[in-house]
Amino acid sequence: MEASALTSSAVTSVAKVVRVASGSAVVLPLARIATVVIGGVVAMAAVPMVLSAMGFTAAGIASSSIAAKMMSAAAIANGGGVASGSLVATLQSLGATGLSGLTKFILGSIGSAIAAVIARFY
């Protein structure tokens, strides 16, 4: 299951539970807060999993993976080497070293914002 589908599913589930169980006006804002937190956590957790699934691992680029195909295409396009700062080089660096604290903060913020927008309509 993709991260966006997982986030959407979690948001919908939280919203439905709140609608069924809520008799008070306080529960709905708490559910929205929970939805926003879930969105941020899912966004932070999904990126490393997606990078690994694509083949950008701590040990390097996995053979016969999407990452290997991307690297091959980038090398052919650049005459034999992958350009520093290119998408492939950046993703390889993220896969090898992991995400920085700032990157996690930004991803969490974006995931929370998306979840807040989704929760607003449910």
Curated annotation (Swiss-Prot):
Consult the record and explain the modifications the protein receives after translation: Ubiquitinated by TRIM21 via 'Lys-6'-linked ubiquitin chains leading to IFI27 mitochondrial migration.
Question: What residues form the membrane-spanning segments?
Answer: 34-57, 71-91, 99-119
InterPro entries on file:
IFI6/IFI27-like, IFI6/IFI27-like_sf
Point out the cross-link Glycyl lysine isopeptide (Lys-Gly) (interchain with G-Cter in ubiquitin) in this chain: 69
Where's the transit peptide located?
Answer: 1-33
According to its record, what are the GO cellular component terms? endoplasmic reticulum membrane; mitochondrial membrane; mitochondrial outer membrane; mitochondrion; nuclear envelope; nuclear inner membrane
Major localisation: mitochondrion
**Which residue stretches belong to region Mediates interaction with SKP2 and hepatitis C virus non-structural protein NS5A?**
76-122
Q: Name one Pfam family in it.
A: Ifi-6-16
Q: Superkingdom of the source?
A: Eukaryota
Q: Which residues pair up as cystines?
A: none
UniProt keyword annotations, A-Z: Antiviral defense, Apoptosis, Endoplasmic reticulum, Host-virus interaction, Immunity, Innate immunity, Isopeptide bond, Membrane, Mitochondrion, Nucleus, Transcription, Transcription regulation, Transit peptide, Transmembrane, Transmembrane helix, Ubl conjugation
Q: Supply one GO BP term.
A: modulation by host of viral genome replication
Where does the record place the region Required for hepatitis C virus non-structural protein NS5A degradation? 103-112
What assembly does the database describe for this protein?
Homodimer. Interacts with hepatitis C virus/HCV non-structural protein NS5A; promotes the ubiquitin-mediated proteasomal degradation of NS5A. Interacts with SKP2; promotes the ubiquitin-mediated proteasomal degradation of NS5A. Interacts with NR4A1. May interact with BCL2.
The protein's job, in short, is: Probable adapter protein involved in different biological processes. Part of the signaling pathways that lead to apoptosis. Involved in type-I interferon-induced apoptosis characterized by a rapid and robust release of cytochrome C from the mitochondria and activation of BAX and caspases 2, 3, 6, 8 and 9. Also functions in TNFSF10-induced apoptosis.
This protein's name:
Interferon alpha-inducible protein 27, mitochondrial
Source species: Homo sapiens (Human)
Q: Lineage, please?
A: Eukaryota, Metazoa, Chordata, Craniata, Vertebrata
Gene name tied to this protein: IFI27
